[in-house]
């Protein structure tokens, strides 16, 4: 990495050339962190893992329109590439792939895309139809673009906060036989427990205070202090918070199960106009 920060590639051809060149010059492994930018400390932890565990660390920054449904925040989603680059420079990331929509989808919406199936139609997928299809499609494309070739380990890093997305990415890799290893990274939280998210910056101070109910309720539920229904009522009773779902699932399949050891509790709620998610193992 240069002393001025990561090299920014805006075209597929350029980032491919850089990866191929650096592998040829001795990089023995490649780590990829796919993001939509608006990076926070949670992303920094993911990027640091990619940096520490690989010779070449690559971060993609692309606000993917396929992941946003009608009425969602695609146009207003924060875009702050210079700030993102400053954070990634501190970590020591080597390459940043920051294409525009035309570069990734030159013909508009792709004719061929990845579908998430039944596991992508529940929980987040029920509220945000098509979201996971869009996420899988772009990451599938990123894997194809970035893969260094046989013989060079290729690892991709995903946060456990997006538990459903993580499971679907793991399934896609298995189903498509991608030469990439998915490495999960634990949730990063604020000092008071709020899961870090790019959308947290939408919250007022008062809303951020109310949002803490998500973490505190998950802790009470996983400790056996609340039933599932009591946990739902507790979240919904919080001012400015509107519950979307609070469920416990088998983390391997996303099938709904009772709140029992080994299950995963997932919550999604609107805090004011901002939608937040969180999860915790029982």
Model-derived features with residue positions:
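Substrate/ligand-engaging "lid" and interaction regions
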Residues: 246
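Active-site lining segments that contact anionic ligands and/or coordinate catalytic metals
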Residues: 243, 262-264
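A structural signal for short secondary-structure junctions
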Residues: 239, 258-261
